[in-house]
């Protein structure tokens, strides 16, 4: 069995879909369906069982046996970069992750987890080293702290001549694609611009968006990276982006091209995001490629075209 936490979320449900396409359906999805809209992400998927996050965590902490587990994809987290309740964030993204990690280490279960490019902050160098990290919000900090916890475990194991089972962290950059309808304000720019045009409006970007550049990565490619590391058993913390920085304007142009209508308009940059907003991200893929992962990443033009063909059918 494979367990996917956050399996009703955007990345988690796409990982389940990718596993299904690889002929794997012995899957336990763990999530919190308080946001009932997320159920739609599971409707077309083939899974063995579903479990509530709190019930799952209780069983993990009790050391319960789930039977043979091939791997755990840990995608469950509070991913709202605008959430400032630090106690809530650290409990969800840090403490919960530690419990699950040690459960896996004790049983030598491969543990593949979601980190984030939010760990980098305002740097212009996106290399998986501590000197380049400096989160701008508590979400990024929760992910940064868990990465550092994993690093300490590796260091301790090395000093004692021990070999840990697989731990692989993925620093997701700006992920977009199908199954993000439930995310509200946290959904991708492509999602919001598409909705605006479908509502008969012009697509709207924040002022300055022609110079805001992010590494936008298509969720289908993210899943390919996850499955490659499961298959190859490589440990480490790796950037998961395209290696390209493209502007928000490029995303808007791709959405306009899909619809063949709409003129890009600008709106004022919101005060609540000032100082907590990454204006530039670009994954350094040196470490990913050195590990042997040869997944090719779609450009914004390619990814948005595929996404909207699915979204608008």
UniProtKB/Swiss-Prot annotation:
Binds 1 NADP(+) per subunit. Signal peptide: none annotated. Pathway: Nucleotide-sugar biosynthesis; ADP-L-glycero-beta-D-manno-heptose biosynthesis; ADP-L-glycero-beta-D-manno-heptose from D-glycero-beta-D-manno-heptose 7-phosphate: step 4/4. Keywords: Carbohydrate metabolism, Isomerase, NADP. The active site is at residues 139, 183. GO terms for molecular function: ADP-glyceromanno-heptose 6-epimerase activity; NADP binding. Pfam families: Epimerase. Catalyzes the interconversion between ADP-D-glycero-beta-D-manno-heptose and ADP-L-glycero-beta-D-manno-heptose via an epimerization at carbon 6 of the heptose. Belongs to the NAD(P)-dependent epimerase/dehydratase family. HldD subfamily. This is ADP-L-glycero-D-manno-heptose-6-epimerase.
């Amino acid at each position: 069995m494979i367990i996917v936490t956050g399996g009703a979320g955007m990345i988690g449900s796409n990982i389940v879909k990718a596993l299904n396409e690889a002929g794997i359906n012995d899957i336990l999805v763990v999530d919190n369906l308080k946001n009932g809209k997320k159920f739609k992400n599971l409707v077309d998927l083939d899974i063995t069982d579903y479990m509530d996050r709190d019930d799952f965590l209780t069983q993990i902490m009790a050391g319960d046996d789930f039977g043979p587990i091939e791997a755990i994809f840990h995608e469950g987290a509070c991913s709202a970069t605008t959430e400032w309740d630090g106690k809530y964030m650290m409990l969800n993204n840090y403490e919960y992750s530690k419990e699950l990690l040690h459960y896996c280490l004790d049983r030598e279960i491969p543990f593949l987890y979601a980190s984030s490019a939010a760990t980098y902050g305002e740097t212009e160098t996106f290399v998986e080293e501590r000197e380049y990290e400096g989160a701008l919000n508590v979400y990024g900090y929760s992910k940064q702290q868990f990465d550092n916890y994993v690093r300490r475990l590796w260091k301790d194991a090395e000093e004692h001549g021990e070999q840990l089972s697989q731990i692989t962290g993925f620093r997701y950059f700006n992920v977009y694609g199908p199954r993000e309808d439930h995310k509200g304000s946290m959904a991708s720019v492509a999602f919001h611009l598409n909705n605006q045009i479908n509502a008969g409006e012009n697509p709207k970007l924040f002022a300055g968006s022609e110079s805001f550049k992010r590494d936008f990565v298509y969720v289908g490619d993210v899943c390919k990276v996850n499955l490659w590391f499961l298959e190859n058993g490589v440990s480490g913390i790796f950037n998961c982006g395209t290696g390209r920085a493209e502007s928000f304007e490029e995303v808007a142009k791709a959405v306009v091209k899909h619809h063949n209508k709409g003129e890009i308009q600008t709106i004022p940059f919101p005060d609540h995001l000032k100082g907590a907003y990454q204006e530039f991200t670009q994954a350094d893929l040196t470490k990913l490629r050195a590990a042997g992962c040869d997944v090719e990443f779609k450009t914004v033009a390619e990814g948005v075209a595929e996404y909207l063909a699915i979204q608008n059918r």
